[in-house]
Amino acid sequence: MNAFDPDIAEDAGSDGCHPLFRDVPTTVEFNKLRKRLLRLTRQAIEDFSMVKPGERWMVCLSGGKDSYGLLALLLDLKWRGLLPVELLAVNLDQGQPNFPKHILPDFLNRYEIEHRIEYQDTYSIVTDKLPETSTYCSLCSRLRRGNLYRIAREEGCSAIVLGHHREDILETFFMNLFHGGRLAAMPPKLLNDEGDLMVFRPLAYAAEDDLEKFATAMQFPIIPCDLCGSQEGLQRNAMKAMLTDIEKRMPGRKDTMIRAMTNVRPSHLLDRKLFDFAGLMLNGEGEGDHAV
């Protein structure tokens, strides 16, 4: 059996649970939700070969529902013996006005979760370089990424783990399709340019609605994402609205879209760098690919 085996029963470790879950009402509905999220997280970890036993992962914690959910699910898997890595929760306080500095340390200390809180006033840098009417998210995220890479190296972590979910990936795909003229989304596993750190997204298969329900049931102390007064651009909001409308009209399409990303056929696209169209030759055997 592998150190990380997706066939291990869902109820492994049912004689106990991580302290995070001890005060949560164990309703049938919540148990189903928790098992579904655990299953999807484990599936993504296995599908994209994220685990190397003994490594140290840096789990980025912003105070939003997704990062709280990510941390809780990884701790749950580790508690059950299904995730043989060390976990370090890291929050980067970027100096946003009115940021409640006590919430995350109080939460992490309460449950004895290993963590690091890092203060770097990138907010002042962003507001100094951009006009007030600008959307700060792009520059802010670049500055955040640089600091997270530095912290991961200082802490001896081999991977930075982010809480992007199914909808984040789909929205990015359609933003690139409609506005960038390319087929690309958020990769579930990425090697940084320097080649010394991996970036993982174990929630790639998880639905945002499920993570929201999970956060509510777990009573996470959510920190608002709009403290800086800047909201993410209209393009992503438009993609989110479009996907919501599609899912409402045709339930299950989001899952179908995610499956499509795992089933790419370069011979049925137009990218000559991915498929050798010039090399196609008549061979008289009738065994070529078939258009559908």
Curated annotation (Swiss-Prot):
InterPro entries, alphabetized: Rossmann-like_a/b/a_fold, TilS/TtcA_N, tRNA_Cyd_32_2_STrfase, tRNA_thiolation_TtcA_Ctu1
Major localization listed first in the record, in broad terms: cytoplasm
Keyword annotations: 4Fe-4S, ATP-binding, Cytoplasm, Iron, Iron-sulfur, Magnesium, Metal-binding, Nucleotide-binding, RNA-binding, Transferase, tRNA processing, tRNA-binding
Gene Ontology molecular-function annotations: 4 iron, 4 sulfur cluster binding; ATP binding; magnesium ion binding; sulfurtransferase activity; tRNA binding
Binding site for [4Fe-4S] cluster: 137, 140, 228
Alphabetized Gene3D superfamilies for the sequence: HUPs (3.40.50.620)
A GO biological process held by the record: tRNA thio-modification
Catalytic activity reported: cytidine(32) in tRNA + S-sulfanyl-L-cysteinyl-[cysteine desulfurase] + AH2 + ATP = 2-thiocytidine(32) in tRNA + L-cysteinyl-[cysteine desulfurase] + A + AMP + diphosphate + H(+)
Cofactor: Mg(2+); [4Fe-4S] cluster
Pathways involved: tRNA modification
Cofactor note: Binds 1 [4Fe-4S] cluster per subunit. The cluster is chelated by three Cys residues, the fourth Fe has a free coordination site that may bind a sulfur atom transferred from the persulfide of IscS.
Cell location: Cytoplasm
Residue ranges of the motif PP-loop motif: 62-67
Assigned EC number: 2.8.1.-
GO cellular component, one term: cytoplasm
Assembly notes: Homodimer.
Function, as annotated: Catalyzes the ATP-dependent 2-thiolation of cytidine in position 32 of tRNA, to form 2-thiocytidine (s(2)C32). The sulfur atoms are provided by the cysteine/cysteine desulfurase (IscS) system.
Family: Belongs to the TtcA family.
Misc. remarks from the entry: The thiolation reaction likely consists of two steps: a first activation step by ATP to form an adenylated intermediate of the target base of tRNA, and a second nucleophilic substitution step of the sulfur (S) atom supplied by the hydrosulfide attached to the Fe-S cluster.
The protein's name: tRNA-cytidine(32) 2-sulfurtransferase
Species of origin: Brucella anthropi (strain ATCC 49188 / DSM 6882 / CCUG 24695 / JCM 21032 / LMG 3331 / NBRC 15819 / NCTC 12168 / Alc 37) (Ochrobactrum anthropi)
